[in-house]
Amino acid sequence: MVKAHVRPVNGMPRLFIDEQMTAPVFFYGCTLFEHRLDIVEREFKMAAQHGIHLFSVILKMGAMPEERQPSIDNLSRYLDMLLRHDPAAKVLVRINVCQYGSSARKWEESHPGEMVVYEADIQDDGEVKADFDSTMTSVFSEDWRKMAEEALEAFVRYFVEHPVYADHIVAYHIGGGESDEWFHFGYREGGCDVSAAAQKALRAHVQAKYGGDVARLRAAYGRDDLNFEDISIAMPIPGNTGRNPYPTYYLSKPEEQIHVDYNELLSTRIADLIKGFARIVKRVTNGDTIVLCFYGYWYELGGDSKSGHFAFQRLLECPDIDGFSSPIGYWDRDLGGTGPYMCAIDSVVAHHKMWFVENDIRTFLLYRREPGDTRDGFQNLYNFEDLYEVYKREAGTQMIRGCASWYMDLAGRGWFYHPAIWEQIHHLERLYDATLPHITPFVPEVAVVLDEEEVYRIASAHGTFGYTTFNMRMTFYRLGLAVGFYTGDDWLAGKADSAKLTFLLNPTGLKGAKGEGALEKIRRQGQTTVFIYGFGDMDTAQMQRLTGMTLARCEAPAGTKLPVQMVFCGSWEGCKNVSAGREVDVNPLFYVQGDYTEAFAQYTIGEAAGKIGFAMKRQDGYQTIFFGGFELDRDLLLRIARLAGVREYGYFGDYILPGPQMMITHTTEPGEKTVHFPRVCDVYDYYENRWYEQVDRITKTLDKGKTFLYIYGSRREIEGWNLPVWPGDPI
């Protein structure tokens, strides 16, 4: 049996196959569609001919007894197809363990109440509509879970014991929920599951959370007549489908605790399912097969707790999970983009887990046309030259951050059926392989921190926290700074201590022991900490202890919200901040009353008009900044970075990722560009095969979408890496 592991080397997660450190570059061929398997087989063959020997296939695992053998047969067919063309192939098996369609409907017949049900399917009398439309078994069903775990164990055991296939499967990618990605099925369109199975799960969750203590339950919920058997999902659900209105931003009242506990369940249930399936794979394979899953899409999903993706810390700390995955961020991925990650990527690396980038960037190739084909809305690459520049950008990012990737023909259409594409991928794979022993972890000077447990208390992220997460992420990627993304727990644990500037996206939970831990980070010498929007239910003393400033709340009149709009003042007068002027309404607003060093901006409208919404406090060797809006734009972020003394590596707007040994750059707009290095050093311009000796910057005039990989340090040491000479782009 082949053995595969993810292990740290120089602090970086590395893929080992049979004890050989291997560049983690895969090709995913979509094996879901029988009528396109001939295309996928051609792509497998072409990839192997160009030196790619890591592959991924996909299938739906049937959990019912009568479905199990067909699932085994399907994977066997896919492996046979692949091994015909590459006897050395090593395979990542992507397998969906959930139950859909006819299988789910059949399950419902014997297990009523275990299909996903949406809030809109509930009648006024509390009963489910007879004609409710659902196509998935609820992930809250315990009977389904047990059956799926048994099926997965039998499935994995078959291939572990197979005389041929056991030598080729190196990883299982456990998928479920919507599109394998562990979102709650249809949550963006229909909302969250309120089925009988979900109701039962919530009662069990609440009982466990409060230790079965009725007194604790009643104190938390503010009801002295409440018992555990009375617990049910409270409807309407704040933020369901992302847009349900709710009078306040933060859920802090006793009568709102049921919503908080339900939001928590939505994520912890998904995490616990993944952990259970991962444990099975590790046990059956004796720990010698890699396990990964889709999870942690905090930024792409706009901070929405209804997604189920906010129990990431549980999975980061799970010894049975080796890695995580997501597609490249969809909204900034093409030529001139940054290819942003959806997750707290630097926490992943800090836990020595590997992030697998699903590189499903659409190419301009199709093997054959089909009825109904239209231009893909996410496609923006129409020639080899542009495609290569994006591939080089992605490869550089992955090398610096220790990530794996699979190049993905999402639907088996022949996106990769051209030898020139495989030549390029093979050259990048050889480069990655040569750098593996030499790269050390990325060292951010700016830390972006999100507390996932506090996301459970956000009534609706749409139009508020979504700006903080989704929008600001893309701005952070374009600042020309060394920016890292972390979980709140990892920040408190010291995993972001290299940063001199920290953005706390939702500091509402920094109370008690957590607050004391935060103070140790905030009060470090040379540290600047930025608090975004507000402080939940903290009192004045708690807010002042964190920030050094006196802050207060401005509550909106009943049935209304307050607009977040500011005008700049003092030394910042005249600044133009489009983001702060965005039409965002929220309740409450927070403002600074006193004990500040400098005010930067004041609110301009409504009850908060004239009150300070943006200010700084210089303290004994450190400084704090409060910003009462939800999104800081590029100019303000750079102003703050300069106040903090953060090193700037280049022009704002371009993508620049500066690692300890190498830097990747990709231009957003044409023009003269200067990149700065952390010190005077020798620089190898890899794609140009050119050396610059003893420099601290390089200036070039460039077109849009040009990628450069700079490797820096001592020329003698870098030449000792024995890097393959870049042969130039194939076409």
Q: What label would you give each PLM region?
A:
Residues 38, 312-315, 475-495:
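A short, well-structured beta->alpha microelement
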Residues 1-47, 437:
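N-terminal carbohydrate-binding accessory modules
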Residues 287, 292-471, 555-589, 600-615, ...:
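Hydrophobic targeting/anchoring helices
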Residues 23-34, 57-72, 130-150, 254-272, ...:
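The substrate-binding groove and active-site-proximal loops of carbohydrate-active enzymes
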Residues 105-321, 327-330, 338, 344:
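Polysaccharide-binding and catalytic clefts of secreted carbohydrate-active enzymes
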Residues 39-124, 147, 159-160, 276-285, ...:
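Aromatic-lined substrate-binding rim segments of carbohydrate-active enzymes
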Residues 387-388, 506-731:
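A conserved amphipathic helix/loop scaffold
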Residues 1-14, 198-205, 597-613:
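Short acidic, Pro/Gly- and aromatic-enriched capping/linker segments at domain boundaries
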